[in-house]
Amino acid sequence: MPNLILPTRAFEVVKKGIDLFHYGGFHMVGVDKIVRETEVNKMTFYNYFHSKERFIDICLIVQKERLQDQVVAIVEYDHDTSTIDKLKKLYILHTDLEGPYYLLFKAIFETKNSYPNAYQTAVRYRTWLSNEIYSQLRLLKNDAAFNDAKILLYMIEGAIIQLLSSEQVDQKERLFNYFLNALA
């Protein structure tokens, strides 16, 4: 869906949909709930989005673009920050359960069979993020391997799973420091 342009009202529905899917999941939130929460009628919803599947696709594309903007701001425009601190900011941004990556992470598990386009959006973001992490690792260590970037991505996702199962926030920090020590 290149050049996604939405009317203001439709964009408000997308923002609310992102919030609903973030907390309720893709299968538990139906069109009726979206319509009720956003106070648009079903006809308007289907006029804007045509189906729940397309609505989910649009929500994930919007979320992916927002997150990519945040990542680019960290790695490209923050010139006063060291590479290690940039990697740490990326790690913290992506392991925040209230943050934008959580929805894309959730989509990997919940959309593969039912919403394949949405699943592909989440997978494409993971690939893009791996490349961004790799470019930062190369600045840190010339002989860094692409697998190092994948390991950090797996650590991000492992930290999310750990946070979902417990309240050990300090473990997240310790895990990142372990990665840096192993890289050195």
Residue ranges, per PLM feature:
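Hydrophobic/aromatic-rich alpha-helical bundle segments in the mid-to-C-terminal region
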Residues: 106, 138-181
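Amphipathic alpha-helical segments used for helix-helix packing
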Residues: 95-117
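Hydrophobic alpha-helical connector segments
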Residues: 58, 72-99, 152
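N-terminal intrinsically disordered/low-complexity leader segments
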Residues: 1-8
